[in-house]
Amino acid sequence: MCIRDSGLSLATLLYTLNFFIAAGILRVHYLTLVLVLSLFIYINELFLQNNRPFHNIAYTFLGLIYIALPFSLLPYFVMTVSGDVSGPVPIEGSEDILNYLLQPEHLIRFSPMLLLGFFIIHWIYDTGAYLSGRWFGKRKLFRRISPKKTWEGVLGGSLLAVMTAVLLSRWFHQTGMITWVMIALLIIFFGTLGDLTESMLKRKIGVKDSGKLLPGHGGFLDRFDGILLSVPVVFTWLQFMMR
C-alpha cells in the first residue's frame, strides 16, 4: 500500500471514529487506533527504501492534521448525547430514527443549527471581506503571501460576521448571543489565518489552484480554507464552555 492510500485510510478512520464518538457509541480512547496506525505508516515508509521517506511522511501527516482533522470534528457540532433513556423511545421523526439506529439506550440530540450557523458566519465573512476589499481596499494585509487581501476587506467582513452572529442568536435560541459572537470572532481571526496559510502553501508549491475541481476559483480547497483552522479552535472553545 502506498503512503497516499495509507493516509486516506487514516483520514477515513479518524472521521469514522469521531462520528461514532460524537454519537456516544464509542469512547474517546478508541482514537488511540489512529496513533497505532500512524506509527505503522511511519515505520512502513522508512523500510520501503523510497528516496524521500521523511518528506512523504511529513506531507501525509500534514494533510491529516490540516484537512482530515477539521472535517472529522464536524459531527460534534450536530450531535450530543444526553444520557440513558429508561423505557422505549417513541419514533416520530428523523431525529428519533437516528436515535434508534445509532444507540437506542441513549438520547442523541441531533441539531444542525450550530453547524449551519458556523458556515453562515464563515460565508458572510468571506463574502463581506471580498466585496469590502474590492470596493474600499487600499492597505495590504499581507502583500508577500496574498497581495489581494486588504485590511479594509477584513474590517468589512468582520462587521458583517458579527452582525450575522447577533441575528443568528435571535433565530437559533438554543445558543446565546455571546456564544455566537465569540464564534464569529474566532472565525474572523483563525479563518483569515487559514486563508493566508492556504495561499502560502500554493505559492510555495508554485500552483494557482489547489486542485482540478473549480479551476479558476483557487481549487476545491479554496472554498474551505477558512474553516480548516477555525473548526478545531471553535470546537475546543465550545468543549470548554460546555463543561
Where do the PLM segments sit?
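Membrane-embedded alpha-helical bundles of polytopic integral membrane proteins
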Residues: 4-150, 154-186
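Juxtamembrane boundary at the C-terminal end of a transmembrane helix
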Residues: 236-243
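Acidic (Asp/Glu-rich) catalytic motifs at the cytosolic membrane interface
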Residues: 120-138, 142, 151, 155, ...
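Short, conserved aromatic-histidine micro-motifs
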Residues: 178-181, 224, 243
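Hydrophobic transmembrane alpha-helices of multi-pass small-molecule transporters
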Residues: 161-162, 230, 239
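A general structural signal for short secondary-structure boundary/capping elements
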Residues: 165, 233-235
